[in-house]
Amino acid sequence: MPHRTQRYSKIGDTMKTIDLSGKWNYKTDIDDSQTIDSIKFENNNFNLPGSTCDNRIGKKTEYFDKISKEAVRAPRERYEYIAPLWLQKTVSIPNDTDGKTVRLFMERVNISSELWIDGVKTDRQIIELSTPHIYNLTGKITPGEHTFTLKIDNRNLLNLDTMASGYSVDTQGYWNGVIGRIELQYEEKEHIDSIQVYTDDKGITLKVVETSDVHSPFKTEKATVTVNVTSPKGDLLGEKIFETKVFNSKQVDYFRYDISEMNYWDEFNPNLYTATVKYECNGHTDIKSVKFGMRTIKTENKKILLNNRQISLRGTIDCAIYPLTGYPPMDIEVWRKNFKTIKSYGLNHVRFHAWCPPECAFNAADEIGMYISVEMSLWLNHDVCALETGEDPIHRQYFMQEAINISKTYGNHPSFIMFSNGNENMGDFDMLNDITTCIKAYDNRRIYTLTTNFDHPIMPCEDYLCAYEAGGHNVRIQNCQDKAAENTSLDYSSAVKDVPVPIISFEVGQYCVYPDVDLIEKYTGNILPVNLDAIKKFMIEKNVYHKLNDYIKASGDLAVKLYKEDIEAALRTKDFGGFELLSLSDYTGQSTATVGILDVFYESKGLISHDEFKNFAGEAVPLFKAKRIFKNTDTLEAELDLYDFGEKKINNPVYNLTVQNGKQVFYKTSTTESKVSIPLNSITKSTMLSVILEVNGYKNTWRIFVFAENKIENNVRMIKSEEELDDIIKNGGKAIVMKECFKNPIHGSFIPVFWSPVHFPSQKPCGAIIDNKHRIFDDFPTEKYPDYQWKRLLDNSVGTDISKFAGEVKPIIETVPNFFDNTASSPLFETEIGKAKLLFCGFDLDGDYPECKQLLSSITQYVNSDKF
């Protein structure tokens, strides 16, 4: 027998619900051949809310035998099912539903639903990704037992292609089912249909949609609307009563409520008010409440103004990757945890990348004070998809309605401050412009842009631009890494000058951190990490699995350094709108893009603490602008600055600057001046200096390198030909073997793989591991992992596969390979071949720059000593 246990609850005064969660009968329909008349239900153990994967329905996913592009594409659902699914349940409808408004509410469905009651089709098919599926059953259902039949179809019915985070194997997958609340709702015909709260600097305007039994132009009903507002502390601010006349079955009224002493909502004080509306009409009363925050947002003079105060967005991206469920969490505690984690790293903003999260995510963001940007599941351009925006005519109508639905459903949330139609769209910008113009006119409670990414002429409806280029200028470091390596002064002021709206730097970072294949054991839910398993097998095959932790730490250290520079470039730019990282946490799709400081479970990889990260990504960040590399005959000229977007402005900041040489203080000052000059001529040995700048308790650090005059040992033999190499091997001696003799050379790079070595094919490595205690570095300052003194050296280097050498090889510098290569290569290593003692050096030591000359000096002194 079907499971009929139902739970009843009340919302407000009149609305009741019947909980339809629990066991449903189900039937698969792989070839979409079933109809309501032919379908036969044989199973009664499908649990809702839940997905087919939750219920172990579909083709079981197996691990791949070996690495391949397909194997590392993304983790997969343990059970894959992409087809219609039929669900059925007998529901007991109570007597008090008679004459009432009745709805079936399903909080989130992927991607379409159809409903039959007792075999009769009810309403149209609903295709909706971002908001609840709601069926109006008023007048279509009577008290007693009824059979509800659902058809859920997760096929690509909207021609979305495969990229948008709301519908992609790379992100949340193609799950089939119903998640969140599933319930029957019923209430009097005279009820409040919706409440929208519009805030300004004097109070609120309530848009209330009231329903009634008025269906004739010759009939009206008198109604009373009473509004109460409760403060964030729970104090009742007062009651206002409005008399109105109802002319339609669904009527819109606007009511004004002024608030004299406001507690604004923002990242520091996420104050939430409650508006309670009582609607009395035709002898019936309905009471509904809505939480809201007193906040306004606009852009003006290239600034984003929240509550008339400039804000700066420090964000990360959520791409709908949730490996335990395989679909968005419908539990507010998950969102609270994630947002608190993000905030602990100094960030205040989350962009939902080509998807819209569920209600509980907004609730958590409201509570915690997180600024949210929402997008539709729209990502179409010919660079990555078969379609461009607008090529499918259904998209204009669908996405216009989708934008309205998102605004209606989530628009009251103060955290919801930004809206974009989608990610990296190209094609019909007339369509995007029409949608944005209409939705902005419909709801002015947030700021808007046509699409996230791609430089373009700013439309009148656009409030900001989020892109990696703006006005023809770079606004992320990816394409200006050489300049960033020279100094800590890079900014995007030229872009700000040329673009009329605030600029947000798009998807900053994307630096590949070697994937932690031991995370496989964390995947205890619906998602099978086939990609990590394939990479692990490949590591074992290449005999590098034992180096996993070293690879993660080295590549992660480099990623942290580069993220720091990317972030600080944005912070240095006056009136810059902000940045959005890709990403604080890993992206596991698109060929395994493990680019995060956190893993996909929002847990630390141990690369940097949240407090250390916050030092350069938080609300107030001291900034030190200077060259990175000096000669000891130079003077260090630096500019001191402060990025200041904390709750309270730091007026007349005092800069406490300390420069350390090892444990010794080399220079120290406390000043209100923005410029300092530090002579370096007292430094006699090449060294790394640590710079610590503190302002009002906020601290930030940098490293700079000072090179003293170097001594070159000219009597060291340097071999550049095979003939010379054969000679020394045969006759004996010691020498440096230069890169001209490297067989099958592997080109080096300081900057690691971008995103994924498979998604964007690349042979680049992901960092290096340096034996910094080796005597070869007695006169060259370095730590275990390279800093910017290695940038030009590594970019002009080659390595070779040291596993191919027959004898013992002692790597001094070991390259961290990318996971699709896993070659154990080195640009600097020692070995003995025949009678020769050799140092293989893949660096170009002829460069006319300080760090190159110093490395040459340090290497030649080592080779010419008895230490070699």
Short names for language-model regions:
Residues I18, W24-D31, N55, E77-I192, ...:
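Accessory beta-strand-rich segments of carbohydrate-active enzymes
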Residues L582-D644:
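Aromatic-rich peripheral "rim/lid" segments of glycoside hydrolase catalytic domains that contact
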Residues V716-S756, K835-K837, C841:
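Short alpha-beta junction capping motif
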Residues M1-S68, K151, R155-N156, L184, ...:
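Accessory carbohydrate-binding/adhesion or oligomerization-edge regions at the termini
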Residues I342, H349-D599:
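Substrate-binding/catalytic cleft of secreted carbohydrate-active enzymes
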Residues Y442, C741-N744, S756-E851:
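Catalytic beta-strand/loop cores that center a nucleophilic Ser/Cys/Thr
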Residues I57, E62-S92, K100-F105, N110-W116, ...:
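Active-site-adjacent substrate/metal-binding segments within catalytic domains
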Residues T142-E145, V209, D213-K298, S674-S677, ...:
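Extended acidic/polar, glycine-enriched regions
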